[in-house]
């Protein structure tokens, strides 16, 4: 049985294959993503992998070839689930895995600009490598740690994508100024009260000088990135240096 959320037609649709469909939409059903889902800005289809099992016990896993602990998700069952969900479609096919390529903001933007991905959520000891190869699944990781399954990772990926879809965020500028949007971590944020436990808001932020505020934010973002993510700082894109406009009053 598949569970579709939002029956409105939409150009961006995510399909999730999981053994625990009740985990969705989860946090994607509230706040920005939830409102966008309810109004048809995106669609979420959740399909139970067990629906593709062929025996009376709805078995989806078996012991690892060569021995070892745990169980492995079967290639035949998962392939059938993928084929049923993606018949005739061409779109990204992802599997959440700690051995995958790290998810970056650039990858998120790429996925958000496309038709929407199919995401496989693994469980147990892993997935039979043959279905990863045969169905051209791209392994994606959200960090160097191991979760109980791919569902939480899929939720994180989808949340990151959905907020970039047109009409989801109130101000597109918010997305443009966030961490990683230009290869830097985001600058510190402040709001009222003006003084908190003898700690004031930096004076420059209340000066009204937009150029100085922008320069301060850029400098703070660079300082934070250099200290916390030197790897990111070393590979950040360099800002375009625009030439000053030619003085047309000169001869």
Swiss-Prot record:
Assigned EC number: 2.1.1.228
Catalytic activity of the protein: guanosine(37) in tRNA + S-adenosyl-L-methionine = N(1)-methylguanosine(37) in tRNA + S-adenosyl-L-homocysteine + H(+)
Keywords assigned: Cytoplasm, Methyltransferase, S-adenosyl-L-methionine, Transferase, tRNA processing
GO cellular component, one term: cytosol
Pfam families reported in the protein's UniProt record: tRNA_m1G_MT
Cellular location(s): Cytoplasm
EC class name: transferase
Positions with a binding annotation for S-adenosyl-L-methionine: 122, 142-147
SUPFAM superfamilies, sorted: alpha/beta knot (SSF75217)
Source taxon at top rank: Bacteria
InterPro entries named in the record: Alpha/beta_knot_MTases (IPR029028), tRNA_m1G_MeTrfase_C_sf (IPR023148), tRNA_m1G_MeTrfase_TrmD (IPR002649), tRNA_m1G_MTases_N (IPR029026), tRNA_MeTrfase_TRMD/TRM10 (IPR016009)
Assembly and interaction partners: Homodimer.
Family recorded in the similarity comment: Belongs to the RNA methyltransferase TrmD family.
Protein name as it appears in the record: tRNA (guanine-N(1)-)-methyltransferase
Lineage summary: Bacteria, Pseudomonadati, Pseudomonadota, Alphaproteobacteria, Hyphomicrobiales
């Amino acid at each position: 049985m598949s569970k579709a959320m939002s029956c409105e037609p939409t150009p961006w649709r995510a399909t999730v294959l999981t053994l625990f469909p009740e985990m969705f939409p989860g946090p994607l059903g509230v706040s920005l993503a939830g409102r966008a889902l309810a109004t048809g800005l995106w669609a979420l289809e959740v399909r139970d992998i067990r629906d593709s099992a062929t025996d009376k016990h709805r078995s989806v896993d078996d012991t690892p070839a060569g021995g070892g602990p745990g169980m492995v998700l079967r290639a035949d069952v998962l392939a059938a689930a993928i084929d049923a969900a993606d018949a005739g479609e061409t779109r990204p096919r992802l599997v959440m895995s700690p051995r995958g390529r790290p998810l970056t903001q650039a990858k998120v933007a790429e996925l958000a600009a496309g038709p929407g991905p199919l995401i496989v959520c693994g469980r147990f000891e892993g997935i039979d490598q043959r279905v990863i190869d045969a169905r051209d699944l791209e392994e994606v990781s959200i960090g160097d740690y191991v979760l109980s399954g791919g569902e939480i990772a899929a939720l994180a990926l989808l949340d990151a994508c959905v907020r970039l879809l047109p009409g989801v965020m109130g101000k597109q500028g918010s997305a443009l100024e966030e961490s990683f949007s230009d290869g830097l971590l985001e600058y510190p944020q402040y709001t009222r009260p003006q003084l908190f436990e003898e700690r004031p808001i930096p004076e420059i932020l209340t000066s009204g000088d937009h150029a100085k505020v922008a320069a301060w934010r850029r400098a703070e973002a660079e300082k934070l990135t250099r200290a916390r993510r030197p790897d990111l700082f070393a590979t950040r894109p360099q800002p375009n240096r625009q030439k000053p406009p030619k003085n047309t009053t000169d001869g």
